[in-house]
Structures are given as C-alpha cells and as structure tokens.
C-alpha cells in the first residue's frame, strides 16, 4: 500500500498502517479531519514524543497530494485536556499566549465557513465547514505575539468559545488562530495545527520569575512605596476615624470581662479594620519620610537608616493624630518625623556619643555661627558668640570642642592616597635622637667620675640612687649587702657626696643639668 509512487515515503509514515490508510482515504475525499490523524497515531501506538515529526512528514505528503487537513471546531477544551493527560507523560499547559513562545511556527490552516454568531451555535460546537487550504508559512515569535491581541478580540465575539486550551508540548497542538488585519472580522477565524521548534526539547520549559530587584536598595524602596497613591484631606479624616474606632474596639476587648459573642465579633471586625486603616495611612505617607530624610544626609548616617528612623516617627504620628483639629496629616507628621531623625542622629551618628541636650546646644551654636558669618563677613569671635547665645566665652569654647568630629588616623592624604593622616602626627613616646645621645654621654661621664672613688663608695652611691638598675635602695638594704649598719652606710654616703661636689669631679657633670 503506497500513497505515492513518485517519491519514497519516510519510514515513520511507511511503517504506520493506519496513517497510510488515512492518506489513501484523504486522496479519495480530498480532505482529512484532525481527529482522524490523532486516532491513527493512537491506533499505531506512535509515542507522543514522535507525533510532531510524524505530523510534519504527513503534512508534506498531504501538500504534494493536494489533500486538505481540517481541524474540527467541535473539540471542547475539557476533552482535549483529558486526551492529552492520558497519552502524554510530560504535560504542558498552553493558553492563547503560547504563540508568543514559538520561535518558528508552521500553520496548516483552513478557513471556516461563515456561521451565525450565537451562544447556542457555539455551545453545540458545530464543526466548521471545509475550505481551501492555505499555503504553509513560517512566523517568528514576535509575529505570533502581535497576533495575540487580535485573536483575543475575535474570540470574544464568539459567545461560549473558551480561550484556554490544554495543549501537549510533545504533540502537534490544536490552536485557534486569527487571520491577519481586517480579514479576521470579515471572514472569521482560522484554525490549524501549530508546529513549534520549541517542541524539539521534551523537557518542560523552565519558568524564571523576575522580581525586578536592582543593585540599588534605595531605588527599589522608592519604587515600592511609589505604588501607593497619595491621600487627600477627606481620605485622611476617614482613615483617622477608622483608626480611632479600632483603638476603641481594642480597648473594649482588652478591658471587658464578658462580652456577648455577637458584640465581640463586631468589635474584632472594627479593630481589624482600624489596623488596616493605620497601615494604609502609613504606606501612603512613606514618601513624606523620604523627602524629610534627604535633608539630613551626609551627617554620619546612611540614607536608608535615616528613612527607617523617620518611619518610626511616622508611626508615632499616626497613633497621635487628631483629625478634629482640622490640619492635614502631613503637617502634623512632619514634626514627629524630624524629631525621630534628629534624635537618632544624636544617638548613633557620632563615634563618641554626646548627650542629646548637648547636641541641641551644639546645633544652636552652629546655626548662630553661620548666621553671624554671613552678617559680619568673617568668623565671629567666642566673645561675640557668647553675647549672642547668652553664655560665657569659656562655655562657647567648650561647646565648640564638643562639636568637633573625630577623624581617622588612616584617612588617606594627597591625590594618590599613598600616605595617611597618622603619618603626620608626632609620636610623643618616641625618643628624640639628640636626647638619646646626650643621655649616653651623661652615663659615660658619670661612670668616669665614679671610677675616681673607691669600690665601696661607688657601690653605695650607685645602689642608693639606682644608677645600675633604676631602683633606689634604702640604707638598710645597702647595709645588708655590705654587712654593716645603716648608720655606717649613711656616713659613707655623706662622705662620698662631699667628694663628688668637688669642682674637679662635678664640673664635667654640670653641663648636663640644663
């Protein structure tokens, strides 16, 4: 049994009896139904993973023989889902957007005959009339995605027609595709098989979720808070009333011993509504915190840290806002936000913490100093600042010392940064070379003078004044060394010092006393 004597059939077609019989019947009838193709594949037990290749070869043969491949419109989505689930081990769900994923698409489509648009006709799922087969064509993924919107409009006109169809990624999928341009509205829908090169891979497509995060946390935060719309005065009052009612309900629930079940449920609902209103008011004013935090950048705290501290002040403002005063919430919340930020800077911004009240004095002094600099055209003196601030000049100098910012010894200097600030600071513990030389000479002269004395006299003086080990000894300790009384040691010391005071010995040592 041969479908054509002029060509050699592919082995996947020639070895399939049902497919060969289907080709012969198509040559006789001039057309083949899509359901018949699927049944032929199932009858020959062709694996679903090979359906695409077999269908591609079959389509080539049908084109040469002039046979039209028809797709029935009566196939319901539920039946297609059941059939695919039964035969395909790897199931992939495709909707009307599946065309956007197709890289190379070949469609064998048939134009359906005009039908009456009604819900009953669509529900009865009448098969579309056969029409002349169109030429096979290839489209890229962009072209398929561009057709998606037009196909959606056309499908909406057909009442009862469902858009979503369950397609198998490894078999030739049936998909309703719209024609191009204005021909869609006049002639109806085109239906056909969609062959995609994406089906070459039997593995399920990997879905990658892109969260939209960037490397800039500030940008991400601003993008997130910008999604909440701003509130007008009426909306702020409405939210404040709900918050007030929620707080009252929470107080009643906490303090009441026994409540009726119905009343308790109502209070819980009101309390929950108050919490939602509080969150709404907070989220709608997060941008106010950002605008205020920008004024305090570059003062020792990161921008995001300033925002976080300002958010704490915003929460406090929401809890204490009194809508009956008639002011907008932003007017009231600004002061709480600024207070929270400035307090956080006073506690955290400095390496050496300064009390909050002293920070306020330092800031006040800095403001007055800047103002007087503009007025006088020069730096004001401590006396002028003291007169302006009503404090003593000594107090002004002391406050200015407190306000100095510490600087790291490792701060790089110069354009190349090859040296550090610590390299320029004198080491107070380092020995001055001149002093070291002078001390060495003094020791030599002192030993030369002691050499003019007797051994006992030199030893007593050396131990008495610690000339050898730097530890002076008492008369008793020296007496025990020489085995004499402390009085005898005192006499030896007195006699020796008289000898050392003689100009012949003391003159060489007097120069080192200056």
Curated annotation (Swiss-Prot):
PROSITE patterns: SIGMA70_1 (PS00715), SIGMA70_2 (PS00716). Residues 281-351 are annotated as: Sigma-70 factor domain-2. Residues 449-502 are annotated as: Sigma-70 factor domain-4. Residues 475-494 bind DNA. A motif (Interaction with polymerase core subunit RpoC) lies at residues 305-308. One of its GO terms (molecular function) is sigma factor activity. Residues 135-205 are annotated as: Disordered. One of its GO terms (cellular component) is cytoplasm. GO terms for biological process: DNA-templated transcription initiation. Induction: Transcription is regulated by the alternative sigma factor ShbA. It is found in: Cytoplasm. Pfam families: Sigma70_r1_2 (PF00140), Sigma70_r2 (PF04542), Sigma70_r3 (PF04539), Sigma70_r4 (PF04545). NCBIfam families: PRK05901.1-3 (NF004561), PRK07921.1 (NF005920), RpoD_Cterm (TIGR02393), sigma70-ECF (TIGR02937). PANTHER family: RNA POLYMERASE PRINCIPAL SIGMA FACTOR HRDA, RNA POLYMERASE SIGMA FACTOR RPO. Interacts transiently with the RNA polymerase catalytic core. Sigma factors are initiation factors that promote the attachment of RNA polymerase to specific initiation sites and are then released. This sigma factor is the primary sigma factor during exponential growth. This is RNA polymerase principal sigma factor HrdB. The gene is hrdB.
